[in-house]
């Protein structure tokens, strides 16, 4: 196992007993070393993917290139945005990591090939990170290979959430017609509350995008569809 693969595994399978080893690897692995088994990613890509602000700062202080690309053309900022997690408690650390990368020179429009970290953040519902990116002063109107800008993607996400809300409301309405355990009822209501909160986050992000003045609400994508 290469040191970079070991580092990735220590992040993916966190173990307090191996915390010292993780820190040792971060201090010893050359900042330009690449994991050929993981798309040529560096230790900075890995630290960003797991929103580890301390490690991000240490790698940059050691000379890591903030806009270094892996074999897929992804920069550390994009790897951060690509993290798939719907755990609310992780959203602020992700946003803080994005802010740190931007402060150290991360380029938003050129954060990936055929897409950007903003598009990816919106796709993965990282609204706090999206707010940081929107506030960065960098270009926001980039589109992906389908011509979709951040508003197109956000509106699709909002529509997905609306469908999930409708389905959950139908399920809750059926409680009076069939037996459903108290645990299932409680979980369904909690899930509905979270979906409704997500819907409001979509609206707030849309407002930020429109207020930026960089994205027109009637702009069409490659298929001729508006947001």
Identify the meaning behind each predicted range:
Residues 2-11, 34-43, 69-86, 110-117, ...:
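Ankyrin-repeat boundary/"N-cap" motif
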Residues 10-17, 46-52, 79-94, 120-126, ...:
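Ankyrin repeat A-helix N-terminal signature
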Residues 146-176:
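Internal, charge-rich low-complexity segments
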Residues 32, 66, 83, 87, ...:
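Alpha-solenoid repeat scaffolds
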Residues 177-181:
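Charged, low-complexity interaction regions
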Residues 24-32, 57-65, 97-107, 131-139, ...:
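Ankyrin repeat domain, specifically the short helix-to-loop turn at the C-terminus of the second helix
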Residues 1-59, 64-68:
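N-terminal segments that cap or nucleate solenoid repeat domains
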């Amino acid at each position: 196992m290469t040191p970079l693969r070991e580092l990735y595994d220590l992040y993916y399978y966190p173990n307090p007993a191996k915390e010292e080893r993780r820190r040792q690897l971060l201090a010893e692995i050359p900042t330009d070393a690449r994991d050929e088994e993981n798309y040529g990613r560096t230790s900075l890509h890995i630290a960003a993917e797991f929103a580890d602000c301390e490690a991000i700062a240490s790698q940059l202080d050691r000379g890591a290139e903030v806009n270094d690309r892996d074999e897929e053309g992804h920069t550390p900022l994009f790897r951060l945005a690509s993290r798939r997690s719907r755990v609310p408690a992780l959203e602020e650390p992700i946003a803080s990591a994005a802010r740190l990368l931007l402060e150290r020179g991360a380029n938003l429009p050129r954060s990936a090939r055929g897409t950007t970290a903003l598009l990816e953040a919106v796709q993965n519902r990282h609204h706090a990170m999206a707010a940081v990116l929107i506030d960065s002063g960098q270009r926001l109107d980039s589109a992906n290979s389908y011509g979709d800008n951040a508003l197109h993607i956000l509106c699709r996400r909002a529509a997905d959430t609306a469908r999930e809300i409708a389905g959950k409301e139908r399920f809750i309405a059926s409680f009076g017609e069939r037996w459903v355990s108290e645990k299932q009822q409680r979980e369904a209501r909690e899930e509905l509350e979270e979906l409704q909160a997500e819907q409001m986050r979509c609206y707030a992000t849309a407002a930020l995008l429109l207020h930026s003045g960089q994205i027109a609400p009637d702009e069409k994508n490659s298929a001729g569809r508006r947001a």
